[in-house]
A protein has these predicted regions:
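Interfacial segments at transmembrane-helix termini and the short loops linking adjacent helices
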Residues: 20, 85-115
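Helix-loop junctions and terminal segments of transmembrane helices
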Residues: 33-59, 63, 126-129
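Membrane-interface junctions at transmembrane-helix termini in multi-pass inner-membrane proteins
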Residues: 63, 111-139
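Membrane-interface helix-loop junctions in multi-pass transport and translocation proteins
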Residues: 21, 93, 134, 141-176, ...
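Membrane-proximal transmembrane or re-entrant/amphipathic helices at the cytosolic face
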Residues: 179-209
Length: 209
C-alpha cells in the first residue's frame, strides 16, 4: 500500500511541477521495477512461520533466521538491480522503443529503490512479530513526508530523474536510516546494516540453513 501511495505522490507532483510528458516517461520505468515487488512478500510469507515458531524458545536461532531473511531479500534485490542497471537501455528500447529513451536513466535510478522495498518487507514482518506495528505506520509516514519534500526540491531542477532520486532517497530513509532514531526498532537498523556487509551475502550462500 505504501509503495502505491509513493508512486501516486510522485506522479501527481511530476504532473504539477514538470508536465504530463514527464509522467509518462517516469511511469514507464516504474512499471518495470514494480513487477518484482511481490517477490519479497512471497518469500517473507513462506519463511515467516519458521522464524516466529522459535522466537520464544530459541532467541539465538530466531535472530539467526531473521538475519538470513534480511540477507536473502536485500541481496536478492541487489541481484536484480545490478543487471537491470547495465541493461536498462536495451530493456527500454525493446519494450517501449526510441520514444522512451528518457526512461533509461529513470530505470537505472529507480531500480535501486527496490533494495529498500525488499528491506521494508522484512522490517515490517519483524515489527509485527515484536508487536511494534505502530512503527510500521510511523516509518511509512516519515518516508512519504521526505519523498514529498525531496520532490519539491528535485523535480523543478531534474524533472522525472529528480522524482526517481527522491523516491530512492526517501525509501532509504524510511526503510533503513530512520529506524536508528527509535530505540524500540533500532535492532532493525542493525539487522539491515549487517546485511549490507558483502560478507553476509557470501555467508548465506555458504550456510543457507
Amino acid at each position: 500500500m505504501a509503495i502505491l501511495i509513493y508512486m501516486k505522490i510522485d506522479q501527481v507532483m511530476l504532473k504539477e511541477l514538470a508536465g504530463v510528458q514527464s509522467v509518462g516517461i517516469y511511469a514507464a520505468a516504474v512499471k518495470l521495477c514494480e513487477v518484482w515487488y511481490p517477490i519479497p512478500v512471497l518469500i517473507a510469507g513462506s519463511l515467516y512461520p519458521a522464524i516466529i515458531v522459535v522466537k520464544d524458545t530459541n532467541f539465538a536461532l530466531y535472530n539467526s533466521r531473521l538475519q538470513k531473511l534480511y540477507t536473502l531479500l536485500v541481496w536478492g534485490a541487489f541481484a536484480l538491480a545490478i543487471p537491470i542497471t547495465f541493461l536498462a537501455d536495451w530493456i527500454i528500447f525493446i519494450l517501449y522503443g526510441n520514444d522512451f529513451s528518457d526512461s533509461i536513466i529513470i530505470l537505472r535510478i529507480y531500480v535501486w529503490a527496490g533494495i529498500f522495498v525488499f528491506l521494508s518487507v522484512v522490517n515490517n514482518k519483524w515489527m509485527v512479530i515484536e508487536n511494534y506495528q505502530k512503527y510500521i505506520l510511523l516509518t511509512s509516514l516519515i518516508g512519504m513526508s521526505s519523498n514529498i519534500l525531496l520532490n519539491v526540491i528535485l523535480i523543478p531542477h531534474y524533472g522525472a530523474s529528480g522524482a526517481a532520486f527522491a523516491t530512492l532517497i526517501s525509501y532509504g530513509f524510511g526503510s533503513y536510516l530512520c529506524l536508528f532514531f527509535f530505540p524500540k526498532i533500532r535492532a532493525g537498523f542493525w539487522f539491515a546494516t549487517k546485511t549490507l556487509n558483502p560478507y553476509s551475502g557470501f555467508a548465506l550462500l555458504k550456510h543457507p540453513k
